């Protein structure tokens, strides 16, 4: 449990891991069980992110991206995540600052630095990392649009995965094998979440 009345759950993983599908199915299940549930995602306020990309694209690097997402995250926490938690909701967030740690570190920023600039962000009660081989994730998403095509190259995604595995090893999140069929992955996630929900 967090210092609030609710429960803050984060789902992490590369695109194609099944985060959003898992989040929606889990939300529906928890609502049926009588919980108040709110789904959200990051990046949150794309006006910040998109404006920076357009105006300062030639200056962009891992450090500028990480700081942009950190500012975006602060708005997200203050305007959406915390208000729902204070009302006793389970908040399911599709990506959080661990995405910045994994992706911006793969771009070249030290992973410890990315974690440092996010150290005062609200800590999740539980973070589940859906681990999928990038080749499988890319195959699952074939033909789908992406907001951030620069993050979809296979060699880059393997670096991202290594960063996620580092975060798992350091105890920041719980790993679920997402290479399997959807129902098996979902059942594991549901079981872990129910074990952590103590109201």
Swiss-Prot record:
Q: What is its EC number?
A: 2.7.4.9
Q: Name one GO cellular component term.
A: cytoplasm
| One Pfam assignment | Thymidylate_kin
Q: Which gene encodes it?
A: tmk
Query: Matching SUPFAM superfamilies, A to Z?
Result: P-loop containing nucleoside triphosphate hydrolases
The UniProt family comment states:
Belongs to the thymidylate kinase family.
Protein's name according to its UniProt entry: Probable thymidylate kinase
Residues binding ATP are: 13-20
Could you tell me the superkingdom of the organism this chain comes from?
Archaea
Organism placement in taxonomy: Archaea, Thermoproteota, Thermoprotei, Desulfurococcales, Desulfurococcaceae
Listed under catalytic activity are: dTMP + ATP = dTDP + ADP
The record's annotation in NCBIfam families points to: DTMP_kinase
Q: Which UniProt keywords apply?
A: ATP-binding, Kinase, Nucleotide biosynthesis, Nucleotide-binding, Transferase
A GO molecular function annotation here is:
ATP binding
* GO process terms (BP): dTDP biosynthetic process; dTTP biosynthetic process; dUDP biosynthetic process
Q: What class of enzyme is it?
A: transferase
């Amino acid at each position: 449990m967090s210092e609030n009345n609710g429960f803050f759950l984060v789902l992490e993983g590369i695109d194609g891991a099944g985060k959003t599908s898992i989040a929606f199915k889990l939300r529906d299940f928890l609502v049926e069980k009588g919980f108040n549930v709110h789904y959200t995602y990051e990046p949150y306020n794309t006006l910040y992110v998109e404006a920076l990309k357009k105006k300062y694209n030639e200056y962009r690097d891992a450090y500028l991206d990480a700081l942009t997402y950190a500012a975006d995250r602060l708005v997200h926490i203050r305007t959406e995540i915390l208000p729902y938690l204070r009302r006793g909701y389970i908040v399911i967030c599709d990506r959080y600052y661990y995405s910045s740690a994994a992706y911006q570190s793969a771009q070249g920023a030290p992973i410890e630095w990315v974690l440092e600039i996010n150290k005062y962000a609200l800590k999740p009660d539980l973070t589940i990392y859906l681990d999928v081989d990038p080749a499988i994730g890319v195959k699952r998403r074939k033909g789908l649009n992406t907001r951030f095509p620069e993050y979809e190259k296979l060699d880059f995604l393997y670096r991202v995965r290594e960063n996620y595995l580092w975060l798992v090893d350091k105890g920041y999140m719980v790993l679920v094998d997402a290479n399997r069929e959807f129902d098996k992955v979902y059942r594991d996630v549901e079981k872990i979440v129910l074990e952590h929900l103590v109201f």
